[in-house]
Each structure stands twice: as structure tokens, then as C-alpha cells.
Amino acid sequence: MANYLPSSPAWLAFSQAAKSASRGGERLRIIEAAGLRVDLTAQPQSDSLDNAAQDLLAQQNFDAARAQLYDGGEANWTERRPAWHTALRADNPPPAVAQDILAERERVRRFVRELDQSLAYDCVLHLGIGGSDWGPRMVTRALRHGGLRRNIQFASNVDSHAVADAIGQLDPRRTLVIVASKSFTTTEPLANAEVAMNWLRDAGVADPIKHVVAVTANVDAALDFGISPDRVFRFWDWVGGRYSLWSAIGLPIALALGNEALDQLLAGAAAMDQHFLQAPLRKNAPLQMALAGLANRSVLGYATLAITPYDSRLMHLVPWAQQLEMESLGKVASRDGTPVGVPTGPVVWGMPGTDCQHTFFQWLHQDTTGAPVDFIVCERPDHAYARHHNMLIANCLAQRSALLRGKSYEDILQEIREHEPDLQRAEVLARHRVHPGGRPSNLIVLPRLDAYSLGALLALYEHKVFAQGVLWGINPFDQWGVEFGKLLAKRIIRELDAPSADTSGDQDPSTRYWIDSLSRR
């Protein structure tokens, strides 16, 4: 990159415009995208900020980076591969990968149809971790209100309490086991697969491997594991784990909800892909969310982002978004290896409303720091309790309004003085009740929670994260921090398995103490 970001002209102009922009929500700003409505009214706004954003996008070569994403260029430059998840959900994938994508897509759907017809399995045990787990787990939980075709349980943690809990809810003779791992060397799914195989064997299943399918980019490793070729579903090394939901990793979604649901999920995401590609800057929802997030994180100093879906069915959206945002944007180096020089990805956290209001909203309203909030709500519910849904919407809108508007010391003092004759006490009480306001938020409104709208919502966040990666000049498609931790864990496992080995010089003092102590348990 030609300019060091913090001292580049476009960044300096963007920073100044963000600091001076209005944060009072005076100008209504709602963007329609793939059936969703995204309200950015409560974000920093001004004409000068819009103009500075356009200059920053030009400086960071955004149009070229976006074209590279869609065209299969080397978007993941540190690993020298594309990040072509948009191709996975396209009706007509790019010619270079169309045959492979369409063939594997049809293999997944044919397999689901065959199982539906044979009634061979009414239980599914899904073993994955990270992107191969959170995506299918989140979608299946979000859409199960329409009914599940199979009893599906997910186990990801290498803590065997998790897989024990999952298999305790399944009939081994009627269970299909899915082992989902890009490399097919990942510790957690393979360790849990061993538990599952023993469980099937102990239940009297004559040939447990016939109950197992694999979803992987390493087909040879799955075959070496003993899985039949017709039960190995493939994706490619250019599919990042946190974007793999759109590939054959979506198999458990189709098994649980049907092929039609998976198709609609992809269609919603594809519609958002087209919006992100074609919509102009001021009407581009992912891009405007990215710019608002950039201003909040790198200029205004907000270190975190709260996501509060006012729909309990989206209970797994937050951990899915945590992985997407924090694994993608928790980076320190720009494209040429120099430090980025500004704060990058925020800590993402949250939970569904209205539970969140009784957990952490006090902090959002009155803490000295605060955080931007993404509020998510559906226009229409899938239950018959209309007034309950009105209550849910009212709480969502009220919390957002309170964070934006705040309440001044003078207004609160006037209210307290109506029933408190002691002026000194009234003044003290008033200071405890001040709400600073001016706290940024987005409101994302879905027509209802169906597969199409959910696909659009997930792609909205994916493209927001990609755009922020471009603006910061970082690679949102690698995860070297994760890989380093895995490497160290493998070394420690060897020492725990063979505590007599003399490796005293390989660890820091605390880690050495605990290896020695816990290996004697």
C-alpha cells in the first residue's frame, strides 16, 4: 500500500469528518438490501463524512479488491488463494469452478433425497469445530420452528462431556455421523469421531464406519479414515472455514430442514452478494455498515460491538459473528507487512433480547465507555401471540432510542425535584441517573425469520467484514493466531501423553509447572 494508513490524506480526512459528524440521529437513513432494511440513522453522519469515505475507498483500492473477491482472484494473499464463497451460492457460478460446485451441490441434495426416501436415519450427530460447526448449528437452531426432519445434535468441543451429552440424546442404530473438517486433521472432530465410533460399536452396530460421512477439502484423508467414497463430500482449499456454510458443510442443514431450506438460504445470500456488488456507495448496506464500524472502532475509540438479536431463535448468531469478525479482523499487519497503525477488529459479544436488557444493557447505557450495538428484529413472528411480538419490538426500539437520545442532568433533576424537596439530595440522585446518549447503533429488520432472510443477513455481515478488511488494509481470510495455538497444543499433548520425556527447556515456567502437575493427576 502506497501510504501508511494513519498518515494518509484520505484517512486523516475520514478521521476528522467522523469526529465532527452528527451523532444525534437527526437524518433518517434506511437502506433496503435483499429484502432486509438496515437503519443507520444512529450512526455518525454528515456530507463531509460521506465524501471522505468515498476518498478512503478509492485510496484503499476498494473496487479492485471487491472485483477480485467475486472473480476468484487472490483475495487471501497470505495463503495465495481465492476466497470464493460468493461462487458457492451463485445460481450460475463462474465458469472456472461451476462444474465442481454444481456437481457437489447436486451430490449433497441427492444424498439427502435418498435418505429421505429410505428412512434409514432419523438421527444425526454432527462433529465439527469453528466454521464447520457454528454455521450449521446456528442455521438449524434459527429455522427449526418449521419442524426438524431429524433429531440433530452438534458436538464440537474436545471436552468429551459435550459429545457424551449429544450422543445421550440419539439412537445409535438410527444415527448418521457427520465428520466435518476442512483438513481432516483437526483435533476436535477427529477425537469426537473416535468417541462416536466406539459408541456405535458398543451399541452393537456391526460396521460403524457405514454410519459415517465426511465433509472435507482433504478427500484422501477421509478415505484413509475408512469412509466410503460415495459418502465423502468435498469442498475446496479456497473455502475458508468461517465461510464454509455455503459449501457441502451445509449438509446437516439439508438433513435437518430439507433441501429447499438450504436452497433458500443460498438464494438469500446470493441476493445480498448482488446488492453488495451493484449498489452505489450511499445505498450499499454492507459498505455503509463497514464504514460506520470503521469510524466507531478506529476513530471514536469503541473497542467492542454488541449484537442483540431480538429473536430467541438467533441465539447462536452471536458466536457465529464472533468467529466471522474476530478471526477475520483481529490482525496487526497490513498487506506489505507494516503495522496497520490504527485499532482494527472489535471484540464482538451479545445475546438475544430481551434477556440482554437484564444482563448487560446497564453497561451500554451508563458506562463511561459504551459500545455500538447491532439490533436485529423480525417484522413478523412465527407464533400466534401478536401482542407478545409487539412487546418484543417495543423493547428493541425503546432500548435503541434510549441509547441514542440519552437523558440530561437538567431534565432528570427537574423530574426528581417534583417529589424530592432536598435540593442537595436531588442533585446527587440526578447525577446517578444521567444517560449520556449519542451511542451508535444499527437496526436490521427482517421481514420474518426464514431461510432466505437468514441467508441475506449472514452475507450482509460477511461483506461488511470484507469491506473493513480492505479499508484497514488487512487480510480477513487468514487466521495465523489460531494456527499458532494449535501448534503449541500439539506439543503439550505429546508431553502430557509421555510425561517422562525431558522437555524442560521447551516451555515457559508456568506452562512447564502445569504440564508437570497435571500429567501426574
UniProtKB/Swiss-Prot annotation:
Active site: E327 (proton donor), H358, K486
SUPFAM superfamilies, alphabetized: SIS domain (SSF53697)
Primary enzyme class: isomerase
InterPro entries, per the entry: G6P_Isomerase, G6P_Isomerase_C, Phosphoglucose_isomerase_CS, SIS_dom_sf, SIS_PGI_1, SIS_PGI_2
GO biological process, one term: glucose 6-phosphate metabolic process
Pathway(s) annotated for this protein in UniProt: Carbohydrate biosynthesis; gluconeogenesis; Carbohydrate degradation; glycolysis; D-glyceraldehyde 3-phosphate and glycerone phosphate from D-glucose: step 2/4
GO cellular component: cytosol
Pfam families per the UniProt record, alphabetical: PGI
UniProt keyword annotations, A-Z: Cytoplasm, Gluconeogenesis, Glycolysis, Isomerase
Example of a GO MF term: monosaccharide binding
Reactions that this protein is recorded to catalyse: alpha-D-glucose 6-phosphate = beta-D-fructose 6-phosphate
Keyword Metal-binding: no
E.C. code: 5.3.1.9
CDD domains: SIS_PGI_1, SIS_PGI_2
Localization, UniProt: Cytoplasm
PANTHER family reported for this sequence: GLUCOSE-6-PHOSPHATE ISOMERASE (PTHR11469:SF1)
HAMAP family recorded: G6P_isomerase (MF_00473)
Family named by the database record: Belongs to the GPI family.
Task performed by this protein: Catalyzes the reversible isomerization of glucose-6-phosphate to fructose-6-phosphate.
Protein name, UniProt field: Glucose-6-phosphate isomerase
Native species: Bordetella petrii (strain ATCC BAA-461 / DSM 12804 / CCUG 43448)
Gene: pgi
